[in-house]
Amino acid sequence: MRLETVRQILDCRVLVGDDRLDGEVSLGCGADLMSDVLAFIKPNALLLTGLSNVQSVRTADIAGARAIVYVRGKLPDKEAIELAKETGIVLLATRFLMFEACGKLYAHGLRGGSELQEGFSDVGGAPLRSTV
């Protein structure tokens, strides 16, 4: 999904990278716990988070994420903005709650990492299976 499409769907404000909205993301990851992000995110992903400090940008950079959408109207601090400029990570902000933002993107075709992983399992190691 193009970042411009993400911007339109979530009615985002562009904070960093308005010249890179033609870039593509291949999946989404919504989390506030950066250890979860590091465990589950894949390169070229879109990170949705309410964590608005520099750690969100550091984590996205380490994980190879292309962009961050800050949810719930959160805005990153100056240090996070500067690091995003240095690393080339696009920063967007939306008023939507994380659940709503992820749902809107999913409804428009963006998928999460678990759908792209073979044999994805929970913490206990047993494969997740639908009971429906």
Descriptions of predicted regions:
Residues 1-19:
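N-terminal, charge-rich interaction modules
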Residues 3-4, 85-89, 132:
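Catalytic, metal-anchored helix/loop core of enzyme active sites in primary metabolism
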Residues 22-23, 27-46, 50-120:
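Feature captures the catalytic cores and cofactor-binding loops of soluble hydro-lyases/lyases
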Residues 115-132:
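Internal, active-site/partner-interface "lid" segment
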